[in-house]
Amino acid sequence: MVYFKKIAAVGKYHDDQAIPDVIAYITRKDKTPSRIILGYHVDMLDIANCMIEVSKHFGKYSRIRLHHFILTFRPVDASLIPLIAHEICAYIGRTYQVVAAQHEDTPNPHLHIVFNAVSYVNGYRYRGGKEDYYELIDRMNSIIYAHGLHPLIPVKYRANINNPHE
């Protein structure tokens, strides 16, 4: 069982510090002791600036700067996280710069995935509407299912928010 949560709030991720702050958070050493961090179409030593440069190149360094979601796994499924992260990032990375980091600072390991709101391919913004959302969920479900796990459960459907695996 894998739980999905999109991090979104009114006004969140709109300011100039959004990309550097989120990248710094998801790649923190205390959160990622195994250092399972991967990225597509970014310099792993300068992730935030790579994303900012693409947005500025296309004249779109305004409004929402990035998209961020979390996949939470059962501890027994932790060994699958790097494989799943790679496949999800390969899918998103066809069009957007993307970074994933496995956090191990809670009983249930979880994967943070962050991608630039502006495409490095054509400069278009990720719209993030219902159609985009469900297309992404469907692709992630097919990846997760291929690894023998049950499809994603969006966080709003969780019975117990404090322990998603009850």
Label each region the model flagged.
Residues 1-166:
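N-terminal nicking endonuclease/strand-transfer module with a His-rich metal-binding environment
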